């Protein structure tokens, strides 16, 4: 089943798309500050592994024009909390174990939101992004197991992951991608382990 969803904000609508295989092993939010051409392919691969996938905008089309919008961690965190509220009210999603796969600039906000909703979010994976920008309080409060995937040439993200890891109290691992390696191999293995655990 496929559905479109929308959340109203003062700055415009946020649109999303739900891919829901039957039966679904769990629900994964694909969290990115703006849609990218690769999103559909990522969602398709995750659904092939049996996961429902919710791809949701975190910024309205109006907000996306502001240069610093993708760095506004408090606003992005609030948007993620609104999405988590939507899931709690939705009959198709509310009973599925929930994970979040964050990409790039969405990562710090995902950590903050998951730390605040520790009974709802069961597992996390991130690919890139400055995870340490989530802040010390959120990093220490996080309980969901976290996989940090980093490209081998992305020294900035790797350094951010190392800084963050020193404060994490949850189960966590870092996976350094080799050149040409598909990050979804590590991500789906991580979700499978922790959804079934």
Model-derived regions, located:
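Serine-hydrolase catalytic machinery in alpha/beta-hydrolase-like enzymes
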Residues: 7-96
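Alpha/beta-hydrolase fold nucleophile elbow
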Residues: 92-106
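Hydrolases whose catalytic domains are alpha/beta-hydrolase-1, hotdog thioesterase
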Residues: 108-113, 135
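A conserved short beta-strand
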Residues: 119-131
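Short beta-strand/loop motif that positions the catalytic acidic residue
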Residues: 142-143, 148-150
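Acidic catalytic loop of the alpha/beta-hydrolase fold
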Residues: 152-157
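Catalytic histidine neighborhood in serine/cysteine hydrolases
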Residues: 165-181
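Catalytic active-site module of serine/aspartate enzymes centered on a nucleophile-bearing elbow/loop
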Residues: 180-197
